[in-house]
Amino acid sequence: MPVLHNRISNDELKAKMLAESEPRTTISFYKYFTIASPQQTRDALYQVFTALDVFGRVYLAHEGINAQISVPQSKLETFRQQLYTFDPALDGLRLNIALEDDGKSFWVLRMKVRDRIVADGIDDPSFDASNVGDYLKAADVNVMLDDPDAVFIDMRNHYEYEVGHFENALEIPADTFREQLPKAVEMLREHADKKIVMYCTGGIRCEKASAWMKHNGFNKVWHIEGGIIEYARRAREQGLPVRFIGKNFVFDERMGERISDEVIAHCHQCGASCDSHTNCKNDGCHLLFIQCPQCASKFNGCCSEQCCEELALPEEEQRRRRAGRENGNKIFNKSRGRLNSKLSIPDPAE
């Protein structure tokens, strides 16, 4: 019987990855296409990726695939060939290569079958996810940014927008993509005659969002090909001004890629200029927040004095207090409400 799941502890896997000397490349990709049997596809692809020492996070559903992974550089071309020949729909698929990468983004391969590769909350049977907006390449993005008739819409979470975004882009204030979709329609009604340009990290969210906007009567809709990652890469390669300001948040150990030198966010504890996300060191919290080096030292990597005090307790007492809590082990746990309640940050949506 083939091994279809990891059998080694996280701590052991992470230590092994950190000790690796071979460089790795962090890659993200997605594809909306029909998968008749997601579980069967998942099991077959897991064996392919495991044989190539691929780490990362992969989601499959009837609607397609969404992946963020790291691949040993010596096996990168073999990986590309095997991915492209795995299914005709994946042939020639664009791979977004990380902009800043130390090769330590992942240490285990997790591959899951889900209802959707992006949780959108859409239950309208008449919605056609393939009726997407037009792609915008890097040069066209810069032209659109100077067009007074264009409105740029950020389809990422509030904490992603906080550390970096395109010039004058509108934030759709929400904690999840499924909450953003109806809000985007509502907020943009007054701009229905404008050119709507949608973007996200790698393209997967803004592609579906563009189809949703068209479904709701918006006719002039574009989305940035390959998202922020592809835009920044192509703009640099082509010698174009990079019009994204700040840092691009990513959902792996790096938690961000520097796009421009500007730091547009602030430490959530003291207000100093800072755009470095971290998780509260208290295992009973794990709040995702922005913390400067000074506050990291002052609070021992915790988000509050309460968590700092709890972290200093004996491990047995910490475990007792964590029992039954909902907050632990949510690595990207930063709902606006929870963040504000723990750090007393005013909610701009209120």
UniProtKB/Swiss-Prot annotation:
Name of the protein in its database record: tRNA uridine(34) hydroxylase
Gene3D superfamilies: 3.30.70.100, Rhodanese-like domain
Pfam family, one: UPF0176_N
Enzyme class: oxidoreductase
EC number(s) stated in the UniProt entry for this protein: 1.14.-.-
Family classification: Belongs to the TrhO family.
Gene Ontology biological process terms in this record: tRNA modification
Cystine pairs: none
Domain of life: Bacteria
Keyword entries, A-Z: Oxidoreductase, tRNA processing
Keyword Hydrolase annotated: no
Record's catalysed reaction(s): uridine(34) in tRNA + AH2 + O2 = 5-hydroxyuridine(34) in tRNA + A + H2O
Biased composition (Basic and acidic residues): 319-328
UniProt GO molecular function: oxidoreductase activity, acting on paired donors, with incorporation or reduction of molecular oxygen
Disordered: annotated segments: 319-350
Active site: 200 (cysteine persulfide intermediate)
Function: Catalyzes oxygen-dependent 5-hydroxyuridine (ho5U) modification at position 34 in tRNAs.
Record-linked InterPro entries: Rhodanese-like_dom, Rhodanese-like_dom_sf, Rhodanese_C, TrhO, TRHO_N
Domain Rhodanese: 146-240
